[in-house]
Regions:
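Conserved CoA-thioester-binding segment of acyl-CoA-metabolizing enzymes
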Residues: 1-56, 78, 83, 89-92
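N-terminal glycine-rich phosphate-binding loop for ADP-containing cofactors
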Residues: 4-9, 18-19, 71-86, 92, ...
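Short, active-site-adjacent cap segments at secondary-structure transitions
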Residues: 58-62, 110-111, 435-436
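Gly/Ser-rich catalytic serine loop of serine hydrolases
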Residues: 103-113
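Short glycine-rich donor-binding/catalytic loop of glycosyltransferases
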Residues: 127-132
């Protein structure tokens, strides 16, 4: 029995309803057989008026089966090319039928699903928030290879197509209609098939209705080919702009742009072959494997609750207390209110608490002005936040999160004075970024209900929450924090307690190695540029300015008071930087009058000249590769140590946490996947070289040597 239900009605319209094995329709081996057979049958039909391609699933079509792609190697190149061309051949046969074909899009049509709809003459979608239209492949180290680049370029033009493809955009039906990705909307699912049939009947006598635009005589690409004056200007600057964004580290993005340029000048069939050829190169490369592994399989694993205690009932947060209305506290209040949670925002003064709420009001106003949010809805959201100075307003909170300064005495005082207002089943979270949760929990009457909930700044933009389980944290508390993170739309990773946990501990090695290079006499601009060349979003000096040298000073003082100085390595460089930059020169960071950089009134910045006087030595020679590897390997090694000692509970948490929380280069798939891709033997050898040249901080963790001996990848 075919997984494509084939029915022809009395009007001569065939409806093919895709209902494949499994939860979604996917472009796998089953699809290839079913589509090939369906097209064969359609080509032999008599009295055919039109075809409707529909879905029996909630999703129209999910695209390629990534399990078939993640293991691709250069040895599979010929098979992949042949298979890709076979899929495209049947799509071409579908769109070259003598009658028009309609894609009846009832749910998400992403990736291969949207590409399949592009092989239809008309795309009609249900106007519902669950329906998403787009081509997200570039976010997985791939590009649309089922004809998506070629057809979309012809349909809406080079620039518009690349904006969607390179941005991995997923659009609402209304937006997709506005940009020309689909042709028609219906308001309900019941309207979908009737609307498709009406259109087929209406155009029955129109010969061009059955011809794709690119197959019509005299066809020109929307907006013209890449050699038209407007597009030629775009083509002259776009590759450079793309390289600035990707640092040349995402070969899929470069290939996608090149294919679109060529597609605008070539016939469709030639362009489709080029698309297949370039796809083989990309899918068999390391970047695609890294990104598919992490951004698809491991991210889905996390979002599905792999780190959440099993057997604990869902426990959504109803009333949240946020203590401290500063940068972090106001951000937490905003994202919670956006999720419909009642928030009590407490600070030492009412003015400070109200200023914290004003942050939410300002963000809501921006969304309203851009048409993204109804004014009445914005008012409802803002009203969920109650600014206060009264502890009693916290009564009945089922979750309280403190977001005050990194001072253990202050945090302990706040815990003891306010946790009594929690509901009977309430839980306490600390937003500390460095202090051990087990030690903070000693101030609590119920340490089993105490947990770390580490947000990242800015809270409204950063997608990650790091949940830290203390030694006494219960499964119920861990589940509560996990559920809260997902409730506010964040991706949660779960780690065990440790000074600095995972993200702050690993991130600090990036700052430290940047500072070490500076102290050694390396030119600061060279440090910054080579850091970005590895794929890091910003250099270590700039990011230290953003996070604040002054904050580092306070943390250092707190750690000294706790008797844990240098627990994770030599802190001498940091102490020198604090003395040189803050004590001697008053350079505390961007928000403290300047740090490594000077910040100018026009918004620009430049290296503070004092750095050259303090540190730069033009006789120092550190080769570029060593600088890049020192910055990268410090972070990778620290991540491996966290995994080896049990701070990290899973490889997935390490990879996703390093990318979303630390800024690990996307092309690596995260700091643990980096080692899989680099190769164990090569990684061990490079660690030995760096260790011999620069010190024991580059010693290879034992766990890598164990994996090298067993041949087992980190997974």
């Amino acid at each position: 029995m075919s997984v494509f239900n084939y029915q022809k009605d009395q009007q001569g319209i065939v409806t093919i309803t895709m209902d494949m094995t499994g939860p979604v329709n996917a472009m796998n081996a089953e699809y290839k057989v079913a589509m090939h057979d369906a097209v064969n049958r359609l080509e032999q039909e008599q009295g055919l008026v039109g075809v409707i391609l529909a879905s029996a699933k909630r999703v129209f079509f999910a695209g390629a089966d990534l399990k078939d792609l993640v293991g691709a190697t250069p040895d599979h190149a010929e098979d992949i090319y042949r298979d890709t061309q076979r899929i495209k051949h049947d799509m071409r046969r579908l769109e070259k039928l003598p009658v028009p074909v309609v894609a009846a899009i009832n749910g998400a049509a992403l990736g291969g699903g949207y590409e399949l709809s592009l092989a239809c003459n008309r795309r009609i979608a249900v106007n519902h928030r669950a329906v998403k239209i787009g081509l997200p492949e570039c976010s997985l180290g791939l590009f649309p290879a089922g004809g998506g680049i070629v057809r979309l370029t012809h349909l809406i033009g080079v620039q518009a197509a690349l904006d969607i493809i390179l941005g991995s955009k997923q659009m609402t039906p209304e937006k997709a209609l506005a940009v020309g990705m689909i042709d028609q909307l219906v308001e309900t699912l019941d309207d979908l098939i009737p609307a498709a049939k009406r259109w087929l009947i209406d155009v029955e006598s129109q010969a061009d209705a059955a011809r794709q635009p690119w197959d019509r005589k005299g066809h020109k690409v929307a907006g013209g080919g890449i050699n038209t004056p407007k597009n030629a200007q775009y083509a002259a600057v776009a590759p450079t702009m793309l390289h600035q964004k990707t640092r040349g580290l995402l070969p899929n993005a470069t290939a996608a742009m090149d294919i679109a340029f060529q597609a605008s000048m070539l016939d469709v069939d030639t362009a489709l072959r080029i698309e297949s050829r370039e796809f083989v190169k990309v899918v068999t490369g390391a970047v695609a494997k890294n990104m598919i592994t992490t951004f698809f399989f491991q991210l889905n694993q996390i979002n599905a609750g792999a780190s959440r205690p099993q057997g604990v009932a869902k426990n959504p947060t109803r009333k949240l207390g946020v203590l401290g209305a500063g940068m972090m506290g106001q951000g937490i209040a905003y994202v919670a209110a956006m999720a419909g949670i009642q928030v009590v925002l407490k600070d030492m003064t009412l003015a400070a608490a109200e200023k914290g709420k004003a942050y939410t009001i300002a963000l809501l106003a921006k969304q309203t002005s851009r048409g993204r949010l109804d004014a009445a809805k914005a008012e409802v959201i803002a009203d969920l936040i109650k600014p206060t100075i009264c502890d009693t307003d916290l009564a009945g909170c089922d979750l309280i999160i403190e977001a005050v300064f990194e001072n253990i005495a202050l945090k302990n005082t706040i815990t003891q004075s306010t946790e009594q207002y929690l509901s009977d089943d309430g839980h306490w979270g600390s937003n500390t970024s460095t202090l051990p949760i087990t030690q903070l929990a000693e101030a609590s009457a119920k340490p089993e209900n105490f947990i770390g909930i580490h947000f990242f700044s800015p809270v409204d933009k950063m997608p990650l929450i790091e949940i830290i389980a203390g030694e006494k944290t219960s499964d119920a508390t861990l589940a509560k924090a996990f559920d809260f993170a997902q409730q506010i739309g964040k991706t949660p990773i779960v780690v065990n307690d440790s000074l600095g946990f995972f993200t702050s501990r690993t991130f600090s090695t990036y700052l430290d190695e940047g500072a070490k290079l500076l102290v050694e006499g390396v030119h600061p601009v060279k440090i910054e540029n080579l850091a970005k060349a590895t794929g890091m979003a910003v250099g270590p000096l700039q990011v230290q300015d953003e996070t604040s040298l002054e904050l580092s000073r306070k943390v250092s003082e707190t750690w000294a008071a706790m008797g844990i100085v240098d627990k994770w390595g030599d802190g001498e460089t940091q102490r020198r930087m604090i003395k040189d930059m803050i004590t001697d020169n008053g350079r505390g960071g961007r928000h403290h009058g300047g740090g490594y950089y000077d910040y100018h009134a026009d918004g620009s910045k430049s290296i503070w000249p004092g750095l050259f006087e303090l540190y730069y030595d033009d006789s120092v020679e550190v080769v570029d590769r060593d600088i890049q590897d020192r910055l990268m390997f410090r972070q990778v090694i620290e991540t491996l140590k966290c995994y080896q000692t049990g701070v990290l509970r899973s490889v997935a948490d390490g990879n996703i946490g390093s990318i979303m929380g630390i800024g690990a280069p996307a092309h690596t798939g995260g700091f643990i996947q980096f080692v899989n891709s680099y190769g164990f033997s090569a990684f061990i050898q490079r660690c030995d070289e760096l260790s011999a040249a620069y010190g024991a901080r580059f010693n290879c963790p034992e766990i890598v040597k164990q994996r090298a001996a067993s041949g087992e990848l980190f997974a």
